[in-house]
Amino acid sequence: MKKKKALPSLLYLVFIVLLPWGVSSSFNKCLELWIKNWWNTRQSETLLTDIQEKRILERFIELEELSLLDEMIKGKLKTHVQKPPTGIHKEIIQWVKINNEDHLHTILHFSTNIICLAILSGSFFLGKEELVILNSWVQEFFYNLNDSIKAFFILLVTDFFVGFHSTRGWELVIRWVYNDFGWAPNELIFTIFVCSFPVILDTCLKFWVFFCLNRLSPSLVVIYHSISEA
């Protein structure tokens, strides 16, 4: 009976692993044209917000100051400047286009990831039976190992996720998530996450080892502490 259920469960596991990549690839192309049309229509029908106007004005002043400084260095600045150089107008237009493209890609990535998470959640909900079978396989495989191998795997997992060098890995993970959703990097959030999340995870793992694993296999806990303290 277990062998008959083996193939569907393995196929379900492969489906879950490949699902995010497939959804991202297919929906990116489908949503890109629709979001572009919506964004262009929205931009043409609405005025600039106060934040956008402020950013454009700051950019204009910055470019004007740089242009005047460049003319001063070249010795071409006149006593009275009647109007800003024509190049500033083109640069402002180009900057606005780039800014709009950034907003568009942010909306596109965010929408694609929300759809992917929704489909993935639905797949987990509909595939409860396969998840139960996979969970039973993992537990059976783990319990059939001797205590030394179990302790080795537990140490490997804990050191990988909460070890000395794990902070760099978690930083890469949070940066990848921000980049995948199209969000602007925030160093403060990165620092808080890297400093707090591994500590919370380490506490949960120690709680599991002390309370849960100690009831299942006291000898395994003894081996685990002996290896970790060596």
Curated annotation (Swiss-Prot):
<keyword id="KW-0375">Hydrogen ion transport</keyword>
<keyword id="KW-0472">Membrane</keyword>
<dbReference type="GO" id="GO:0015297">
    <property type="term" value="F:antiporter activity"/>
</dbReference>
<feature type="transmembrane region" description="Helical">
    <location>
        <begin position="181"/>
        <end position="201"/>
    </location>
</feature>
<keyword id="KW-0150">Chloroplast</keyword>
<keyword id="KW-0630">Potassium</keyword>
<keyword id="KW-0934">Plastid</keyword>
<dbReference type="GO" id="GO:0009706">
    <property type="term" value="C:chloroplast inner membrane"/>
</dbReference>
<protein>
    <recommendedName>
        <fullName>Potassium/proton antiporter CemA</fullName>
    </recommendedName>
</protein>
<dbReference type="GO" id="GO:0006813">
    <property type="term" value="P:potassium ion transport"/>
</dbReference>
<keyword id="KW-0633">Potassium transport</keyword>
<keyword id="KW-0813">Transport</keyword>
<keyword id="KW-0812">Transmembrane</keyword>
<feature type="transmembrane region" description="Helical">
    <location>
        <begin position="107"/>
        <end position="127"/>
    </location>
</feature>
<feature type="transmembrane region" description="Helical">
    <location>
        <begin position="145"/>
        <end position="165"/>
    </location>
</feature>
<comment type="function">
    <text>Contributes to K(+)/H(+) antiport activity by supporting proton efflux to control proton extrusion and homeostasis in chloroplasts in a light-dependent manner to modulate photosynthesis. Prevents excessive induction of non-photochemical quenching (NPQ) under continuous-light conditions. Indirectly promotes efficient inorganic carbon uptake into chloroplasts.</text>
</comment>
<dbReference type="Pfam" id="PF03040">
    <property type="entry name" value="CemA"/>
</dbReference>
<dbReference type="GO" id="GO:0015078">
    <property type="term" value="F:proton transmembrane transporter activity"/>
</dbReference>
<keyword id="KW-0406">Ion transport</keyword>
<keyword id="KW-1133">Transmembrane helix</keyword>
<keyword id="KW-1001">Plastid inner membrane</keyword>
<comment type="similarity">
    <text>Belongs to the CemA family.</text>
</comment>
<keyword id="KW-0050">Antiport</keyword>
<dbReference type="InterPro" id="IPR004282">
    <property type="entry name" value="CemA"/>
</dbReference>
<feature type="transmembrane region" description="Helical">
    <location>
        <begin position="7"/>
        <end position="27"/>
    </location>
</feature>
